[in-house]
């Protein structure tokens, strides 16, 4: 088997496990980058720990961001573990690179006040008001963008102050309590 054929086997496994289309698309995109180093025509038994380590060095020389390097390595490691577990190739240890933790820049209090300031309903456009409601809901609940997009009016329980998030990354629905001010914002919206 070639490396490319083995990557396709892993994609088929992802489909069989019913992974999301976005996840499969991510792997395909990652493979395009990995194929710049490992030819898809390379026999899989030629992929050794030495070649893996050479790839790590190649990434360090060609990419400046350690997080990006680890994203490619994580995808490759996951694929290779699948191949090793299914005895398509010999087993060897792999690891991603060590990354320095960066302090994430957060909003200042002034920026938060500006972002969360209620627009004048009589003067703002619907889009401005909608953006403010969405911002408040995201800050209030911490839900993901995709979960927000999939929300329906019926998912808001105004009586019990609960938001039913049906679509989540883990595919497990969530019941999120809403505070009274968020409920009032949603009622106006």
Question: Where in this protein do the model-derived segments appear?
Answer:
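Short, cationic motifs built from Arg/Lys/His that form the positively charged side of catalytic pockets
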Residues: 71, 77, 130, 143-144, ...
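Basic, Lys/Arg- and aromatic-enriched nucleic-acid-binding interface segment
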Residues: 101, 105, 114-145
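Short, basic/aromatic-rich helical patch in the C-terminal catalytic core of site-specific tyrosine
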Residues: 76, 134, 148
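Short functional hotspots where side chains directly engage DNA or cofactors
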Residues: 160-166
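C-terminal catalytic core of Y-nucleophile DNA break-rejoin enzymes
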Residues: 168-188
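N-terminal helical hairpins
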Residues: 1
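N-terminal core-binding DNA-recognition domain of tyrosine recombinases/integrases
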Residues: 8-103, 118-123
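Short, charged phosphate-coordinating catalytic segments
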Residues: 138-160
């Amino acid at each position: 088997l070639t490396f490319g054929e083995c990557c396709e086997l892993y994609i088929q496994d992802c489909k069989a496990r019913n992974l999301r289309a976005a996840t499969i698309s991510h792997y395909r995109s990652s493979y395009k980058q990995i194929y710049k180093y490992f030819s898809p025509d390379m026999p899989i038994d030629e992929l050794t720990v030495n070649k893996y380590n050479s790839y790590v060095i190649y990434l360090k020389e060609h990419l400046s961001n350690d997080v990006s390097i680890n994203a490619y390595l994580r995808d490759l490691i996951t694929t290779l573990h699948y191949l090793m577990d299914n005895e398509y190739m010999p087993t060897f240890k792999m690891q991603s690179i060590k990354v320095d933790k960066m302090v994430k820049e957060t909003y200042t209090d002034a920026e938060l006040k500006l972002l969360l300031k209620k627009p004048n309903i009589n003067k703002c456009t619907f889009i401005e008001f909608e953006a403010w409601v969405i911002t408040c809901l995201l800050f209030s609940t911490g839900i993901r963008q995709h979960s927000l997009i999939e929300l329906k009016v019926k998912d808001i329980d105004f009586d019990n102050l609960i938001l039913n998030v049906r679509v989540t990354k883990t595919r497990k629905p969530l019941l999120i309590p809403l505070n009274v001010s968020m409920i009032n914002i949603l009622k106006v919206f």
